[in-house]
Amino acid sequence: MIQQKTALEKLMDERKSVRKYEPGVTIPREQIQHILEQATSAPSSSNLQPWRFLVIDDQEQKKELRIAGFNQEQIETSSAIIAVLGDNEMYKNAKQINDLNVELGYMPRDIADMMIANSESAYSNFSEIERTNIAHLDVGLISMQVVLLAKDMGYETVIMGGFDKAAFAKKYELPANELPMILIAIGKPAMPARNSSRLPFEQIIRFSS
């Protein structure tokens, strides 16, 4: 039986969804960039890394975005909103990614060429809905890393999936292949977040044999 929690386990326990932020707190862009760069170690389908980030830290833009965000207060009062976008044409990055793997010595040329061919062939034949579903999954994975890294740096966050995605895409003139999927508010809390219960562990796990 594990008795003492690791630093990672404590961080995961302490991370909460915070919706009340101290207005007027500025997070240096260098810190946000550091969080997002470190988060890119997240896994993704075929390592195609379909995530893209749009950081909104201008107060007037956050105020305007609150309307598309169904009037959620934290969109305006947090220090910044990190919009996580999903590229549903992720297979077009296969060559760049795998060429870099060769350059860095991570894989031989023949394996990289196979990865490029397989990714371009398979993903280009998936439907747009299938590719979007893959991007959704990968965006969720990197978003979890973002909020844990933010917590480790002393900031609180909340992940939001409920916002007018069409209005967001129009406002920021996103290309058709970049789909807004998640908004992450980040900042300093104005009050502690509530704890939240979890289903009994025995209810959510079973072994196959």
How would you label these PLM feature ranges?
Residues M1-S209:
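Acidic, surface-exposed loops and disordered segments
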